Each structure stands twice: as C-alpha cells, then as structure tokens.
Amino acid sequence: MSEIRTLGEFIVAKQHDFPHASGELSSLIGSIKLAAKIVNREINKAGLVDITGASGDENIQGEQQQKLDIYANDKFKAALENRDQVCGVASEEEDEAVAFNKELNKNAKYVVLMDPLDGSSNIDVNVSVGTIFSIYRRISPIGSPATEEDFLQPGNKQVAAGYIIYGSSTMLVYTTGNGVHGFTYDPSLGVFCLSHEDMKIPQDGNIYSINEGNYIRFPEGVKQYLKYCQEIKPAENRPYTSRYIGSLVADFHRNLLKGGIYLYPSTQAYPNGKLRLLYECNPMAMLIEEAGGKATSGEERILDITPTELHQRVPFFVGSINMVDKVQNFLDEWQD
C-alpha cells in the first residue's frame, strides 16, 4: 500500500521552499481546509435540509444570492478570522472588503480574496460547485487594519491560490508558486490526501468550454474561433468537443486534467466580461500558469492587470497554452 500524505503533512514538508517561512501561510491554508470540510458537509445534505435555493437577497453585482452562498461566505470568513493569520478578506458576496479588528488580526501578514461558492445555482440540480481563493501579502503597515489597497494588487503578487471542487469526490487544489498539487478528501478519515502531485495541463487539448447560447453576442474573433473548433479536420483532431458545465471550477478542473480551453468573452450585455478579476480570474490564472498553461483577457496577461475596484470584471480565456494562443490569434485578426 502506498504511503498516504495528508495536506497538512505536505504543506509542512514544503515550507523549506520559503526561506522566511514562519508557518503562518501553512496555518492559513489549514483554515481554508477546515471551512471546506464544513461547507462540503452542508452541500452533501443539500437535498435533505433547507439550504438550497435563493435567499431573496442580491449581491453587489445584482445577482441572486443562494442560501449556500451566504452559508459558505460566513464559514470561510469565520475560519479565516479565528486563526489570526489574516488581517482581512474580500469576497464576491460582500459589497466591501472586511478588515478583521482583533489585535492579532491587525498584526497578520495576509489578506484573502474568495468566491466562497462558485456555481451555486447548480446546487439544486446536483452539479459540481466549488470555492476559489487567493492569498496576498498585505502592503499596509502591520499592526493597522487592512485597507482596500491590500486587495487591489495585480495577480502576479499572489503568494498562493487554489480551489475546492465539491463533486463526486471533494478535492482541494492549490499552488504557492512551486507547482500545482491536488488533494482528495477522505470522509472516513476526515483528511485531504495527496492524490495529484505536480499537476500539468497538456499543451494541447480538444475540449472547449463556453456558453454557446450567447453566440450571437460574442465578439467576431470568438465566433470565428468557434467555427474553427467545429471544422471537420481529422488530421488536426478537429472538430473539438464542447463541454460546458456552467461552474467555472468544474470546467477548469476538467480542462486542467484533460487539456482544453475555457472562454468567457465580453458580450453586448457584459462589455467588460462577466467573471471577477480578483475572485475568479487571478487565482485560476496563477494555477494554470503554474501548471504550464496560459490565461489572458484577450488584450493582456490576466496576472499583469492592475485592478481598480474590488468587483472588477474582465473577459477570460484560460487553458492549454496552444489553445489560448490560437484563440488570441483569432481575437487579434478579427478585432471589432
């Protein structure tokens, strides 16, 4: 029987990658792990208790909040505040960043940005959902409350990023800039066990993930790329396969393992794109680049964008490097 390595053991073993590590980042990821277990438990009971459906409230983007959105947001926020390694959080479900005011939190080095439950509208139909997180070192003085500037940093300043996918099994996938590693939750032991070490996305793939129902509203370059994907060219392994779940974490996870591209372009309704730069695009971009892939807005590298507001949106193209380069060629050629 092969040796079982837990997430906690793996993080401790990797601390030597950080010359000035004091264990705080490891403990922070432990807080995320704890909240993930709690949220996973509720998701698994979703059909049995009154936790599914809309809450009746809207978030700052004007989107209907699901009951589990609020539940997950509260659990992750509490877990991060209670361990004292985080001075503040910004969440897709919060209008503004939240500064933790306990003295120990003010002395913390890190801020966390998160989408506590991506794809939550799929809960009612038992489709995979996820949590996305991003960790930065604060830039405001230690000992003071967190400021908005701590959160408005470009993605290339992230010290860690990851996601949890709640599906047929629950997995936590993360990077600290030294490879992408996946851990599968063993409910009988109550631990995340290393199952996918040093994950790499294939340079090419034959899967494209996009909501083609919005085709008429896409930029011309995206329309032309989709025609390219659908052409019958057996020598080039085309046509490609269309796979779109409607949950970013689930689509991204499949493409990471199998090779592919995820596209969420601008549309007439969302000229700046729909996905959030800070809560969704930056962490996924860090992960994909660490795995050998690529992420772009169609105009620039996602990780090089300097955000101007917490809920900023951008077009998003992410996946296998050759596929992202190909769609970029179409975007450049067919500029509207």
From Swiss-Prot:
PROSITE patterns: FBPASE. Mg(2+) 1 binds at E92, D115, L117. It is found in: Cytoplasm. Keywords: Carbohydrate metabolism, Cytoplasm, Hydrolase, Magnesium, Metal-binding. It catalyses: beta-D-fructose 1,6-bisphosphate + H2O = beta-D-fructose 6-phosphate + phosphate. It is an enzyme of class 3 (hydrolase). The keyword Cytoplasm applies. This is Fructose-1,6-bisphosphatase class 1. The lineage of its organism: Bacteria, Pseudomonadati, Pseudomonadota, Gammaproteobacteria, Vibrionales. The gene is fbp.
